[in-house]
Every structure is written in C-alpha cells, then in structure tokens.
Amino acid sequence: MTQDPNAEAQVAPTEVGANAAESGERQLSAEASDAYSSHEVSVADRDFASIAEMGHTASRLDPDAPAVLTVDNLKMYFPVRSSGVVRRTIGHVQAVDGISFEVPKGGSLGLVGESGCGKSTTGRLITRLYKPTGGSMMFEGNDLAKLSNKEMKPLRRDVQMIFQDPYTSLNPRHTVGTIVGAPLEVHKIVPKNQVLSRVQELLEVVGLNPEHYNRYPNEFSGGQRQRIGIARALTLNPKVLVADEPVSALDVSIQAQVVNLLQDIQNEFDVAFLFIAHDLAIVRHFCPEIAVMYLGKIVEIGDRETIYSRPHHPYTQALLSAVPDVKQAAVGGRRERIRLEGDVPSPINPPSGCRFRTRCQFAQEICAKVEPPLLQIGKRHKVACHFAGELGAHPATPVTTDLLGVDDQGSPVPGATPSNTQLTIPGYEKTWYDLRTKQTTGA
C-alpha cells in the first residue's frame, strides 16, 4: 500500500533496527538523574495497582459522554502470496474481522487480548497507518476508512499514536527537539521561530527538563524515552490518542508513572484514549470500559466492574483467572486458574462458527455451525457467546470461585450475577441459542 510520505511522517516515528536499539543504552546523565530523582518510586513488594493509586484513582465512566470515534464492522485482511515468479494471492490473514466499538469523548476504552489477536493492527487502522479492508471508522462526520491519504492529512493531527517500544520508536540520529518538533513543521502549526518554545513546553508537560531538547534519545532512560514519545503525540493537540501497549517495555515503577501521566494528560487536554494492552491490571486502572479480543474478533465488551467481577465469556474468564489478585487475597480467597488447551488457531484459516470453540471447555455442536452474535445482555455489556442467554450460568460448574465477584474495595459480592437491565442500546442481536431448550430464544 502506498502512502503519502508527508502524511505518514507526523504519525509514525522513524523505525530503527535492532542495532540502533542496542546503541540506545539505558543510561541517564547525572544532571537529569538528580533533577528528576523525585519521580522514581520504590516497588519492593508492591504491585502496579498499589503504586498507581498512591496519587491517582481509577478513571470513571461517563455514561452520557458522546462518542468521538465509532468503529463498525472493521476488517483488515492481509494477503498471503505464493512464492515464485508469478505471485498469486492464495489466502488472507484475517487480522481484524468485523469488530465494532465506540470511544467516548474525553474517555478511554481498553482493548485487551493475547498476542496476535489483532489489538495493534486495530490501533494502526484507527490512525490509518493501514487502510482497512472493510468497515467504517466515523470521526466527526468523516469515515476515516474511506478517505484517501490526501484527504486524511488534515485529520491526522486529531488522531495520534503512542508506540510500544521507546527504544526503537525514536530516531537515534535526531535530537529530542527535532523528534518532537517534526509534526509542527509538517503541519505548519506554528512559525519556525516558535517551534523550540513549543517543544520545551511539551517536554515540561510530560515531566522532562525542557533544557534537554538538544540531547539524543540514548541519553535518556526507557521511561523518559516513552515520555518523549508521548510529547510527540501531543504536539498537534489530538482528540484521540491510540496508546499501543505504552508501558509494556518498562519497569513496573515506571509503568505507574507513565500511566498516571497519561491520566493527567487526559484530564487536562480532554483527549480520548484507545488503550491497547495485555496487562489487565493496568487496563483496570486506566479504562472504565474494556473490550476483549480473540483471533480478530471482540468477544466481550463492558464496563470495568462487570468485566472484572462478572465476566460472561469463557475466554474473558480464562484471562482474568491468570491475573494475580491482591484483593482476592485480602478477603482470604483465591481465584482458580483456568487453563486453556491447545494453541491459538491460525488467522489464515480460523475455525468455523465461534473462533474460541477449539479451546473452550463448554463448546457444543452449535458453536461449530453458527458464529455467535455480539449479544447485548446489559446496559453497557455485550458478549459473543451462544450461552450468554444463561447470564453466565454455563452448563457446568463454573471453574472460577465464588470470590471472583469482588468490588473495587475488595469486598466479596456474594452470588454476583448481571443486573436485570433493560436493553437500551440498539444495533446488537438479542437472540441466542439456549443449551437447555436446544433452540434459539430471545431477551
């Protein structure tokens, strides 16, 4: 796919190879270390949540916030070509296959799942680093999926990306001032004689010494490099930020600092986040609403309390069972581990029907024949499972313990079940296959 180099320049940083990453040693000058030693946090015997909550509370959901970004039936198929002189398309990698979600204005949506499920591809589709195979991405009346590169250029300033690896996402041959100031020059946001002052202002916003604008990336630690990446993403005052696992490459103490910084930025600039991560503890702290992906599909989406206390999809339950929970331990309980059998199927040839059925202990014949719809079973809760009509009461004893229902204060919620909420959000199927009656039923 051919893209306008000027359009891409402000969104995608220069990618450098492994050698460049090795040259960016994790060293910090004595001056910078002394100036910002107050940012360092001891993490002995602490987890992410306890560190993050020292100065920041978990983000809250605003149910009345309008959507700034609406994604509908988004698809991304990468062609697989044969070898030889005549290269033919012999298949497609279905990286993203028909997902739908909304990102609220000034809010955040978490996107979680195993490696290879399509999370990062989704983020690159939102920023139009990839052009979608199908579907729509509505942003302020514009369908980003249908725009040409030329039409996208003025909108790129509104949708920016924070990349995962702070060591390879910064060009080691450019100074911090050049890296952060590049988007300003591409879009001519400010006169050239004001670029430096704007760069220094942004460095101060992200907690770096503004006088270090003339230093190179290898003179900063990993956490500070990620702050540089955040400053670059903020340069154009975006309305949507796609954070692609922004803290996965950092130490846990630095993770908490960076996530708290992102919260401060969200509160100060009213920017919306699509927060991509595989660390469920971080997502729980930052995102009041979470979507769970598996093999290119969204299998469950809901608010924080519902997803973490009363997950309905077997895959979500398995993910959460693998997360150490200090709140469970605080009330004397434990969460039994759900171990998934087998490997994740190939996205080139995914299973028929439900894509999770090959690893699901509750799979039935209907799961192989019919793909489950994303069913709305609560006001802000949707599940893609044929047995969602039983509201979590699967046809076998639940693998997770009763203490899985724990509120945000760590108190157990006995017999936690979804609330009997009226279906208020249109656009989702309201029927499912009931295992007990062996027929399709409705809400």
Model regions and ranges:
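P-loop NTP-binding/switch modules centered on Walker-like glycine-rich loops
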Residues: 239-242, 246-332
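Conserved ABC ATPase "signature" region
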Residues: 142-143, 194-211, 320-321
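Helix-to-loop junction immediately C-terminal to a conserved catalytic motif
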Residues: 127
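Short catalytic/signature loops enriched in Gly
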Residues: 36, 44-67, 79-87, 92, ...
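Conserved ABC ATPase signature
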Residues: 216-220, 224
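Conserved ABC transporter NBD signature motif
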Residues: 135-143, 155
